[in-house]
Amino acid sequence: MEKIAFVFSHAPHGTSFGKEGLDVILGVSSIIKKISLFFIGDGVLQILKHSKSENILARNYTSSFRILSIYDIKNFYCCKSSLIDRGLYSHNQFILKVNILNSYFFRIKLDDHDAIINF
């Protein structure tokens, strides 16, 4: 496998999908060099800058997404309609530098990968 896409489609709290996804990415980044992250649906909430997880007595692991640049992971994509549906269409709200794509181009980018793993 040359290129792997990790798709985050769940909210950061209430399940452990996001944290587990981040752990898997960090684990495989030493053997797979072309990794991209896609955020769609409630998954766009994973990368909000001003998440207040302490209000629900949860640990804020989402700030850990920032360390991905150390692992040379730089391809981050958000679904534009998912952002609009949640009232989040502003580039400065995210902890990562994301490329915001409409549904068509989001799918084109996703199809360019050899494997897709959803969290």
From Swiss-Prot:
Subcellular location: Cytoplasm
Alphabetically ordered keywords of this record: Cytoplasm, tRNA processing
Source superkingdom: Bacteria
One record GO biological process: tRNA processing
Cellular component GO terms, alphabetical: cytoplasm
Major localization listed first in the record, in broad terms: cytoplasm
Function: Part of a sulfur-relay system required for 2-thiolation of 5-methylaminomethyl-2-thiouridine (mnm(5)s(2)U) at tRNA wobble positions.
Subunit-structure text: Heterohexamer, formed by a dimer of trimers. The hexameric TusBCD complex contains 2 copies each of TusB, TusC and TusD. The TusBCD complex interacts with TusE.
Family: Belongs to the DsrF/TusC family.
Protein name: Protein TusC
